[in-house]
Amino acid sequence: MRLQCVVLFAALTLVAATHAPPNVKTVLSAEQHDIPVKRLLRPGNPAGKEDEERGINFSSVPGFEKLANLLKPKPGLKKLLKWADAKKPPETVFTRLRLDKTGTQLFDNTDFPVWAAYTRSVAQTDSEASAVMLKTLVSRYSDEVLSGMIAAAKKSSKTESIATKLETEQMRTWLAAKKTPDDMFLVFKLNKAGDDILSSPLLSAWTNYMKLSNKENPKAQTTLIATMTKHYGDSGVSQILAAARKSPATQSTAKRLEAEQVQLWLKKGRTPDDTFTLLSLDRAGDDLLASPQFNTWMKYINYYNKENPDEKTTVLAKLMTHFDDEELTPILVVARKVPSTESTAAKLQAEQFKNWLSADKSPEEAFTLLQLDKAGDDLLTNPQLTNWLKYTENFNLNKEINEQVTAIQVFRAQYVDDSRIANMVIAAEKVPNTQAIAKRVEDELFKGWTVVLNKPDDVFINLKLETVGENVFESPLWSFYTKFLEKYNTANPGKEQTMISGLARGYNDVTLTNMLLKAKEAPSTKTLATKLEDELVQYWLADKKLPDKLFGYLELKESVDGILTNPVFNVWLKYLNAFNDKAPVKKALMIDTLKSAFGDVAVSNMLFAAKKDPGTAKVAATLQTALLSKWVLEKKTPGQVSAILKEGAGADVSAKLLATYSAKFKVRWG
């Protein structure tokens, strides 16, 4: 028993050295101090006072007192020697040391190394000691829990050695019990770890056992990737590895397993179509490209092509075996809106467009497939529009196409009225990110109008400017129209059109005249309105409108009262003067129009009233003189004129004017 005591003392000395506070010096082993081993300890004699009788005087060993103090208030060295002398089973000592109360913190307890040392002292070999310890631990902990504790203990320098020995012994027992790696995968509940499996502390223990099992059972070898696939499926494993690649701690392992997964598929002869289904990508929907499994699948196609050059394929070709254009295109459209999938989607869409061009798929069909027909007023902010415009350009490059398709043709068919398209352009021009596409669509629209419409006036109507009314000059569509008109006139010298032409097409004479008069009152539109008023006069002249007719068109016949102060009358008068300047031989007289419209009495009364207003007195006097001259030419007798004058003017005024008329009449007719 003397050797056993020496071993125990030496082991405890090592424990003391390992777990002592910094100020406690290391206690040397018995061998280092040449402890005499003269005879075995007698059973039942405790260490201490009778040490010398045993041949081992522990009290005289340097460091003994420090070791004894370190073990307080734990069972002292003497008690341990007594237990060893009495051949107390390690399991009993485990309980005496209250290690059965430590739970999963067993390896952190300072009494655990004491127990380990005790067990080693009573065992014949290290291997036997490990087996005895494991037996004790297995009776208290499940394989899963104990393996986790051992894995944690291996990370500490204080417990690494004993934990490694326990793990080795644990695996020997599993092998003896014919437990497969798959059995232990379930025991460790790694089948439920999900995305955390690669960071699980139990994975290391399982991997070690797998390697040991493979060595012992070469005909039943397995791998981590094969076992994971069995429990999680190809799709689940791919998802786990994608998540693991994002963590620095598991990134390298994930990459290695991905490579193994690919090799596993190749070994099993999986085709890209097979793996597409295995990874559940056929059920991914619009999020297909965002699926972690999609990247795995694309990589597999590359490996597959290298291994099978005669069956070389592409990602798009394989996608088209699972989706038609109506299904795949929306998936790519969605993916191009997401930064993480935009690049991949762009490449696939470019390849898709090539296929469409080869199949002579029309721009109209492409417009619908790209879901641009559902964009509404957000068409110009849709990122797919640029791609579609490029496709349309490439489509028109095909020399076999009989008739080219312009973008604006498709737009107009989709949106029906040009005003909606124009409003979208106007809105997009205000946003920096869409200014370029807005300019492009604007050019397409202008080009389309020039080709399709007969004249610019049609554009005014197409933009529905005839419905705006007196605020037309403040409408963004008016500016859009005038911009087109300017470009049209520049491109068609000699065929220039005026702004008034479209206005006259959309509004009648009186409405347009009143609109211009209203616009002249606002500082922001005064200059434009004045210019347009002059253009309107010229437009009427070109249309050869007779002053009398225009007088009616302008609704001036409604009332003679205050007509000389009516702004519309002044516009008519401007036209009358312009008309007479253009036809000097046969001039139209204002008085004739007034007489025709209101009659002698009404005109006479109006002139009498107008002469009383300083603002119209002068023109009224001129018109009154013209009226008298007209009556003379009509051979109205002074009596007839007297009757007319008496209805409106005062007696004195009538008498004076009648005298003037009588003199004129006498001079002309005698």
From Swiss-Prot:
InterPro entries: PexRD54_WY (IPR054463)
Motif (RxLR-dEER): 39-54
Sorted UniProt keywords: Glycoprotein, Repeat, Secreted, Signal, Virulence
Chain positions of LWY repeats: 127-217, 218-308, 309-399, 400-492, 493-583, 584-670
WY repeat intervals: 79-126
Keyword presence, Secreted: yes
Renumbered residue ranges of the record's region 7 X 93 AA tandem repeats: 79-670
Origin: domain of life: Eukaryota
Entry GO terms, CC: extracellular region; host cell
Signal peptide: 1-17
Keyword Coiled coil on entry: no
Domain comment, as recorded: The RxLR-dEER motif acts to carry the protein into the host cell cytoplasm through binding to cell surface phosphatidylinositol-3-phosphate. The C-terminal region (residues 79 to 670) consists of seven imperfect tandem repeats, including one W-Y motif (WY1) and six L-W-Y motifs (LWY2 to LWY7). WY1 forms a 3 alpha-helix fold with one hydrophobic core and each L-W-Y motif forms a highly conserved fold consisting of 5 alpha-helices. The units contribute differently to the virulence since WY1, LWY2 and LWY6 are important for the ability to suppress the biogenesis of small RNA in host and virulence activity of the pathogen, whereas LWY3, LWY4, LWY5 and LWY7 are dispensable for PSR2 function.
General function of this protein: Secreted effector that possesses RNA silencing suppression activity by inhibiting the biogenesis of small RNAs in the host plant to promote enhanced susceptibility of host to the pathogen during infection. Interferes with secondary siRNA production by associating with host dsRNA-binding protein DRB4. Inhibits the host salicylic acid pathway during infection.
Quaternary state and interactors: Interacts with host dsRNA-binding protein DRB4.
Name the record gives this protein: RxLR effector protein PSR2
Origin species: Phytophthora sojae
